[in-house]
C-alpha cells in the first residue's frame, strides 16, 4: 500500500510512519514544543472561522478505534470516531455532502467507478486505523483537509480549556520541570530530593507526652482517678501517692512496650516499600518510591500503585483505578498528556510518565493535609468499653449498698456506724481501687502489639492490629491456587503442534510474545528457559521484537510485533480457547484441540495456545499453531497443611482463574475434594439449592474473574462466615478489601498490598496457617486476661462488701493498692505467655466471658468468706493445729495474703482450656507469679505501716484510714497457702462444667493433651492438633452431600439422554 492519497506533510502521514517504524510512540518535549508554537496562530484563525460555519447533517456514531497518532496536536482518529456529529464547512460542494450522507452524486459515482481498483487495493490499510464509518472521507480530499484543520482547531480549543482549568500542556510541563523523556541525572535528582524532600506524606507529628497520657484516658482510668480524688478528700496521702503510682506504672509500661513493638513492625513495613522503575542517567533502575523527585521519568505497569502525580508521555492501553481519590467506580482510560494521581492503581496496560509532584504537593498529599483522618472505634475498643462498663456497674452496685448500709445505720448488722469519720468514703475507696482492672487496656494493647511482632517473625506483617482478632476468628480461607497452593514454578512439557507445524516454531513464536528482563512473569520465564535450553543453536538475531503487548486480563493474551528481515508478523500466546477461537483454522482443528486441552487438564497440565499472523499491517487473520503444556506442581507441604487447617476449623477453598478441569485435578492432588464450580454454573445450577449454599459447601471455584471473587466473599459473609482472602494482583483488590482478612501473598502488587490487612513475606499456605495459630494464641492471651480481670473485680468487690456489711470489717485501702500493683505487674507478662491455640475459630463472646468470670469470682468469694468466718467467729484452727488467735488488725494481714494468693492463682485456671495442671505457663509468667507472691507473703507475715503514728485499733469506733495493718505470722501464712491450694483444685472442674453448659462440649483429653504434661519438663508441645472440630465435621458432611447430589443429578441427566 502506498500513501499517495495522504498529503506527505499531514499528521496522518507522520502517524503512519511512526506506527511502522517505532515500537512505541514517543513524545518528546522538542516535538510538542515545535508543533505547539508553529500552528498556534493558524489554529486561532481557524477557531474564528469555525464559529461562522454551518453544521451539516450527521452520520451515526461509530465505535472508537485505537489511536494511531499519539501527538496531542495531531489528528486523533479515535476522537473522530467518538464524536457523534461530523461538521463539514459550508464551502464544501453539494456533491461532497451527498457522498458523506450516503447519497453519492452521479459525478462521484463515475469517478468511483474509474478508480474502484485502487480503492479496493487501499481499503485494507485504511481500515486498520480509520473508522469504517468515515472511510468516505478519503473519497473527497477537500472534506478530509477541512476535517484535519477542524480537528486541529478542536484540539487547540481543548488545550486552551485545559490551560484555563490550570492543566498545562505536556510540553509546558516538561519545560518547567527542565526534564525530557530520558529522565534526570543522579546528581540533579539528588539536588531536587534535598530541595523538595522525600516522596512521602509526612507522618502526623507525634507528641510522646500525649501518647503517654492517652494510656490514662479511658473509663477504667477515670474511675481510678476518681479514687485518687477521694483519697485527697480523706487526707489519705499515702493512698493518693500509691494510686497515682499505679496509674503511672501502667501508662509507662504500656507506652514502652507498645512503642517497642510498634517500631519493630513499622520497620518491617518499611522494608515492603514499593520499588519503582525509574530512568536515571539514561538507564532504567529500580528506586524506592520515596526517592522520586519532580522530573523523574518512571515506567508503570499493571498492578502498580502510582507513587506520585505524573503526566503520561507514553501509553499502552492504560486504565487507572482512581476510586480511592475521586470515587469513580470504573477505571479511567488515560492517554498521552493526561494526568495520573498518586495513590491510584494501574488496572491495565503500562505507561511511561514524568513525575510532576511528590509528597504533600500531590493531589493526595494536599487532601491529606486538609482533612484530619479519623479512625472509627476498633473492635477491641468496643470490647474494652463493654467490659469496663460491666466492671464499673458491678462496683457501683456495691458502693451503693455500702453507702445505704452506712448512712441508714443498720446497727443490727453493722456496729459502730455513723461515727462521723467519713467511713463510707473510705469503704468506697477500697472497692474503687481493688475492683477496677486498671491494667486491662495496657495489657491488651501490649498483647496485640507484641503479637504483631510475633506474627512478623512468622513471615506475616500486620498492617491493621484489629486483623489479629479477625484472623483468629476466620473459618473460611479462599486461597489463590498459583503460588500459594502450588510452587508457581511452571515447567514446559513437550509442545503439541497442529498439523505439520514444527514444534520449535510453536515454542519460538511463544518466545517472541514474551516480555523481557524483570517484567517476565512465570509463564514467560518458563518458555524463555525452555526455548534457550532445548534449542540452544537457534539463531534469534534476525527477529527483532518491535513491540510487546503485555498480558491483558480482559482478553487473556500477550502479543509481540516482530520484524523479520524487513517483514513484519505478530505472534500471540494466551488462554487456548481465546487464541483458538480467533484463528482461521478453528473449524478444522477446534474440536480436536479442545479435546486435547481437556486431556491435558485431566492430567494436571495448563495449556497455552500459540498463534501467528502474517496478515500485515492489520493482522486480522490468525493461524493457530498448537499448544504448550505447562505444569505448576503443588507444594510439598500443601496437602498436609490443608488437613491441618481443617483440624483447626478452617475450610480452605481454592480460587483460581484456571480452567475447571485444571482446578479439579489440582484439588484432587491436594485432597481438597471435587466440588469445584464456575460462577455461571452456580447462577444456573439445577441442584435445587440456593447459590449461597452451593458457595458455602463448595471446595473451590475456577475460571474466576475479579467480580466473581468479590461475589464469593460477599455470599460467604452473608452466611455469617469470617472470610480470609488471598491475592496478589490489582484485580484481587476488591475481594481483598471486602474480606474480613485480606492477605497479600509474597510478591503481591502494590495495589494488593495497599488494601490487605496482612502481607506475607514468604510463599505457601503453611505461612497462613502458622499466622492463624499465632493469632489464636494472641487472642487466647487476651481472653484469659479479661476473664481473670473481671473475676478479680467480682471477687474483691463482693468479698469486701460482704465483710463490711456483715461483720463491719474495714479493710485497709493500702492493701488493695498493693494487690493491684502486684497483680498488674504479673499480668503484663501474659502477653508472652505460653498458650495452646484452640482447634476452632476464636472470637469474643462476652456472655461466656462474664459467665466464667462470675463463676470464678463468686467461688473465690466463698473461699475467703468461709476462711474469715472460721477464724473470726470460731477457734477451729487454734484448737486443731494450735495456731494463736488473731486480733482484727492481724486478721487484716491474713485476709490480704489469702486474697492475693487465691486471686492471682486464678490466672492459671483461666489460661488453660482443659486441666490447668497439664498446660505449663510461660517461664516469664511463672517467674512473675513467684516474685509477686514472695512479696505478698512477706507483707502478710510482717504487715505494712504507712503513717508511723497511725495504727488500727480493736475499738470498732476507731477511724480506719487504711494505711497500716499488722502481720499474721508465718504459721498463719502457711495455713493461708494450704487453704488456697485446696480451694484451687476444684476450679478446673468448675471451668469444664461451665464450658460444657455454654458450648455443649469440652476440650477432649487425648494423647496429645496427656503428652503436654511433659511440657513441665521442657519437652516440645506437639504442634498439630488431632481433633477435628464438630463444625468442620459438619461442613465436610455438607460437602459430601453436595457431591452426592451433584453425582445423582448427572446420572439422571445421562439416563434421560439415553
Curated annotation (Swiss-Prot):
Residues 1-29, 96-111 have a biased composition (Polar residues). Residues 1-212, 259-387, 448-783, 834-849, 911-922, 989-1058 are cytoplasmic. Disulfide bonds: none annotated. Its main location: membrane. It holds the Pfam family Cation_ATPase_N. One of its GO terms (cellular component) is plasma membrane. The chain crosses the membrane at residues 213-232, 238-258, 388-407, 426-447, 784-805, 811-833, 850-870, 890-910, 923-943, 968-988. It is a multi-pass membrane protein. InterPro entries: ATPase_P-typ_cation-transptr_N, ATPase_P-typ_cyto_dom_N, ATPase_P-typ_P_site, ATPase_P-typ_TM_dom_sf, ATPase_P-typ_transduc_dom_A_sf, HAD-like_sf, HAD_sf, P-type_ATPase_IIIA. P-type plasma membrane H+-ATPase (proton pump). The proton gradient it generates drives the active transport of nutrients by H(+) symport. The resulting external acidification and/or internal alkinization may mediate growth responses. PANTHER family: CALCIUM-TRANSPORTING ATPASE. This is Probable plasma membrane ATPase. It comes from Dictyostelium discoideum. The lineage of its organism: Eukaryota, Amoebozoa, Evosea, Eumycetozoa, Dictyostelia.
Amino acid at each position: 500500500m502506498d500513501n499517495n492519497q495522504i498529503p506527505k506533510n499531514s499528521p496522518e502521514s507522520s502517524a503512519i510512519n511512526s506506527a511502522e517504524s517505532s515500537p512505541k510512540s514517543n513524545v518528546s518535549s522538542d516535538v510538542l514544543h515545535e508543533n505547539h508554537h508553529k500552528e498556534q496562530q493558524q489554529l486561532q484563525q481557524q477557531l474564528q472561522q469555525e464559529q461562522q460555519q454551518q453544521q451539516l447533517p450527521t452520520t451515526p456514531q461509530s465505535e472508537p478505534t485505537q489511536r494511531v497518532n499519539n501527538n496531542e496536536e495531531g489528528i486523533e482518529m479515535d476522537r473522530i470516531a467518538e464524536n457523534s456529529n461530523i461538521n463539514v464547512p459550508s464551502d464544501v460542494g453539494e456533491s461532497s455532502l451527498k457522498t458523506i450522507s450516503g447519497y453519492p452524486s452521479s459525478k462521484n459515482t463515475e469517478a468511483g467507478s474509474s478508480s474502484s481498483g485502487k480503492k479496493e487495493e487501499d481499503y485494507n490499510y485504511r481500515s486498520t486505523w480509520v473508522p469504517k464509518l468515515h472511510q468516505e472521507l478519503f473519497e473527497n480530499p477537500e472534506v478530509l483537509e477541512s476535517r484535519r484543520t477542524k480537528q486541529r482547531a478542536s484540539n487547540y480549543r481543548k488545550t486552551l480549556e485545559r490551560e484555563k482549568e490550570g492543566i498545562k500542556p505536556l510540553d509546558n510541563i516538561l519545560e518547567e520541570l527542565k526534564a525530557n523523556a530520558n529522565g534526570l541525572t543522579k546528581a540533579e535528582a539528588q539536588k531536587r530530593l534535598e530541595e523538595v524532600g522525600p516522596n512521602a506524606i509526612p507522618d502526623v507529628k507525634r507528641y510522646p507526652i500525649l501518647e503517654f497520657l492517652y494510656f490514662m484516658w479511658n473509663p477504667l482510668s477515670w474511675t481510678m482517678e476518681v479514687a485518687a480524688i477521694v483519697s485527697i478528700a480523706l487526707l489519705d496521702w499515702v493512698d493518693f501517692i500509691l494510686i497515682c503510682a499505679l496509674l503511672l506504672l501502667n501508662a509507662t509500661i504500656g507506652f514502652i512496650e507498645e512503642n517497642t513493638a510498634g517500631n519493630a513492625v513499622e520497620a518491617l513495613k518499611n522494608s515492603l516499600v514499593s520499588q519503582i522503575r525509574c530512568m536515571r542517567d539514561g538507564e532504567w533502575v529500580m528506586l524506592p518510591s520515596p526517592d522520586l523527585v519532580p522530573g523523574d521519568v518512571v515506567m508503570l505497569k499493571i498492578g502498580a500503585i502510582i507513587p506520585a502525580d505524573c503526566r503520561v508521555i507514553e501509553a499502552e492501553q492504560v486504565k487507572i483505578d482512581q476510586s480511592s481519590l475521586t470515587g469513580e467506580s470504573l477505571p479511567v482510560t488515560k492517554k498521552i498528556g493526561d494526568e495520573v494521581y498518586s495513590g491510584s492503581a494501574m488496572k491495565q496496560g503500562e505507561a511511561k510518565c514524568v513525575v510532576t509532584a511528590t509528597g504533600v504537593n500531590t493531589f493526595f498529599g494536599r487532601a491529606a493535609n486538609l482533612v484530619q483522618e479519623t479512625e472509627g472505634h476498633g473492635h477491641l475498643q468496643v470490647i474494652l468499653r463493654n467490659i469496663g462498663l460491666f466492671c464499673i456497674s458491678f462496683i457501683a452496685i456495691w458502693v451503693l449498698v455500702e453507702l445505704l448500709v452506712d448512712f441508714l445505720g443498720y446497727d443490727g448488722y453493722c456496729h459502730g456506724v455513723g461515727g462521723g469519720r467519713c467511713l463510707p468514703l473510705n469503704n468506697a475507696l477500697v472497692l474503687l481501687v481493688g475492683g477496677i482492672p486498671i491494667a486491662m487496656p495496657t495489657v491488651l494493647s501490649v498483647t496485640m502489639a507484641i503479637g504483631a511482632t510475633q506474627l512478623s517473625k512468622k513471615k506475616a506483617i500486620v498492617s491493621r492490629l484489629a486483623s489479629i482478632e479477625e484472623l483468629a476468628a476466620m473459618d473460611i480461607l479462599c486461597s489463590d491456587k498459583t503460588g500459594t497452593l502450588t510452587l508457581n514454578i511452571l515447567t514446559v512439557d513437550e509442545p503439541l503442534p497442529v498439523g505439520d507445524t514444527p514444534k520449535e516454531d510453536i515454542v519460538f513464536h511463544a518466545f517472541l510474545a514474551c516480555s523481557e528482563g524483570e517484567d517476565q512473569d512465570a509463564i514467560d520465564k518458563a518458555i524463555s528457559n525452555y526455548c534457550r535450553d532445548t534449542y540452544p543453536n537457534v539463531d534469534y538475531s534476525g527477529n527483532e521484537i518491535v513491540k510487546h503487548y503485555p498480558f491483558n486480563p480482559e482478553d487473556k493474551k500477550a502479543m509481540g510485533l516482530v520484524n523479520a528481515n524487513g517483514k513484519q508478523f505478530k505472534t500471540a500466546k494466551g488462554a487456548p480457547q481465546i487464541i483458538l477461537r480467533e484463528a482461521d483454522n478453528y473449524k478444522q482443528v477446534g474440536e480436536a484441540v479442545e479435546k486435547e486441552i481437556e486431556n491435558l487438564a485431566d492430567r494436571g497440565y495448563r495449556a497455552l495456545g500459540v498463534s501467528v499472523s502474517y496478515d500485515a499491517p492489520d493482522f486480522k487473520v490468525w493461524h493457530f499453531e498448537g499448544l504448550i503444556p505447562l505444569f505448576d506442581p503443588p507444594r510439598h507441604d500443601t496437602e498436609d497443611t490443608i488437613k491441618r487447617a481443617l483440624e483447626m476449623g478452617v475450610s480452605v477453598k481454592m480460587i483460581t482463574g484456571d480452567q475447571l478441569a485444571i482446578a479439579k485435578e489440582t484439588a484432587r492432588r491436594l485432597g481438597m475434594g471435587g466440588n469445584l464450580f464456575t460462577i455461571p454454573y452456580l447462577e444456573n445450577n439445577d441442584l435445587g439449592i440456593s447459590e449461597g449454599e452451593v458457595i458455602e459447601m463448595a471446595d473451590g471455584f475456577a475460571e474466576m474473574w475479579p467480580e466473581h471473587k468479590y461475589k464469593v466473599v460477599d455470599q460467604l459473609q452473608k452466611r455469617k462466615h469470617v472470610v480470609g482472602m488471598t491475592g496478589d494482583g490489582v484485580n484481587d483488590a476488591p475481594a481483598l478489601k471486602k474480606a474480613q482478612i485480606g492477605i497479600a501473598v509474597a510478591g503481591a502488587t502494590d495495589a494488593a498490598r495497599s488494601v490487605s490487612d496482612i502481607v506475607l513475606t514468604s510463599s505457601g499456605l503453611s505461612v497462613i496457617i502458622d499466622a492463624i495459630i499465632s493469632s489464636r494464641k494472641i487472642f487466647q492471651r487476651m481472653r484469659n486476661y479479661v476473664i481473670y480481670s473481671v473475676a478479680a473485680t467480682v471477687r474483691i468487690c463482693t468479698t469486701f462488701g460482704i465483710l463490711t456489711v456483715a461483720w463491719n470489717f474495714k479493710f485497709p485501702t493500702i492493701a488493695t493498692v498493693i494487690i493491684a500493683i502486684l497483680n498488674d505487674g504479673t499480668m503484663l507478662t501474659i502477653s508472652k505467655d505460653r498458650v495452646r491455640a484452640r482447634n476452632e475459630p476464636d472470637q469474643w463472646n462476652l456472655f461466656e466471658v462474664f459467665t466464667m468470670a462470675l463463676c470464678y469470682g463468686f467461688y473465690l468469694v466463698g473461699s475467703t468468706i468461709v476462711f474469715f468466718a472460721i477464724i473470726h467467729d470460731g477457734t477451729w484452727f487454734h484448737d486443731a493445729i494450735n495456731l494463736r488467735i488473731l486480733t482484727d488488725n492481724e486478721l487484716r494481714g491474713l485476709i490480704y495474703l489469702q486474697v492475693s494468693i487465691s486471686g492471682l492463682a486464678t490466672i492459671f485456671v483461666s489460661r488453660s482450656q482443659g486441666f490447668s495442671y497439664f498446660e505449663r505457663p510461660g517461664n516469664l509468667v511463672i517467674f512473675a507469679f513467684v516474685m509477686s507472691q514472695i512479696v505478698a507473703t512477706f507483707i502478710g507475715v510482717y504487715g505494712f505501716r504507712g503513717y508511723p503514728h497511725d495504727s488500727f485499733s480493736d475499738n470498732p469506733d476507731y477511724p480506719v484510714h487504711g494505711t497500716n495493718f499488722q502481720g499474721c505470722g508465718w504459721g498463719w501464712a502457711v495455713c493461708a497457702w494450704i487453704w488456697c491450694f485446696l480451694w484451687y483444685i476444684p476450679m478446673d472442674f468448675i471451668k469444664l462444667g461451665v464450658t460444657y453448659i455454654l458450648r455443649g462440649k469440652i476440650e477432649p483429653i487425648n494423647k496429645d493433651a496427656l503428652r503436654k504434661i511433659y511440657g513441665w519438663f521442657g519437652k516440645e508441645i506437639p504442634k498439630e492438633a488431632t481433633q477435628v472440630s464438630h463444625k468442620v465435621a459438619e461442613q465436610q458432611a455438607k460437602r459430601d452431600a453436595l457431591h452426592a447430589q451433584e453425582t445423582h443429578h448427572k446420572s439422571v441427566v445421562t439416563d434421560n439422554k439415553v
